[in-house]
Amino acid sequence: MTEQEIRQLIHAQRRFFFTGETIPVRYRMEMLRRLKACILKREKEIELALKKDLGKSTFESYMCETGLVLSEISYMLKHTPSFAKEQRVHTPLAQFHSRSFRKPSPYGVCLIMSPWNYPFLLTIDPLVDAIAAGNTAVIKPSAYSPHTSQVIKELIEECFDPRYVAVVTGGRAENTCLLKEHFDYIFFTGSQNVGREVMKLSLIHISEPTRR
């Protein structure tokens, strides 16, 4: 994907986010159910890709990757309605006629950058949380686990409109192009050296990064 295509993708996601379509809880729940169905449909493909990339057994693939993702989806399906509710908070005396609430709100367009060692779990698990929170997401899986990255790309393309969730594959050139753009939140999992670079570049656009 070229730099121009990446920029157009991010702009398309931002426009989609501003429509407000991702905000209703019922939409988030529907998307989580759709993701779960797509994962279950492609479970064997995911298992095979993890074996090719990392030599993981069927047991390890499920217990350390796919099963944990499915568990996170189940958790979010159960708790997203309560997480999204307004929370009553104390009202200052000067505004005693009023009532005060804290309302959880999504960030907007998120970037998820994942590593090679747990390529399915550390890509899709953050995506589950991004969807549950009402965001859109661009996913950049690792170039060092190519078979798993390809399965993730095919799964996401089958499951979602690219204006909502999209995958950008490739290596350092694509990483650099992505980090030049404005994201509202960046979720990065990887080495400290790369994490520092992500942090530095994200601050140019005042993005809020999470490093892990």
PLM regions with names:
Residues 93-207:
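Rossmann-like NAD(P) dinucleotide-binding subdomain of oxidoreductase/dehydrogenase enzymes
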Residues 208-212:
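Short "domain-exit" segments at the C-terminal end of structured domains
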Residues 1-101:
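N-terminal Rossmann-like NAD(P)+-binding subdomain of aldehyde/semialdehyde dehydrogenases
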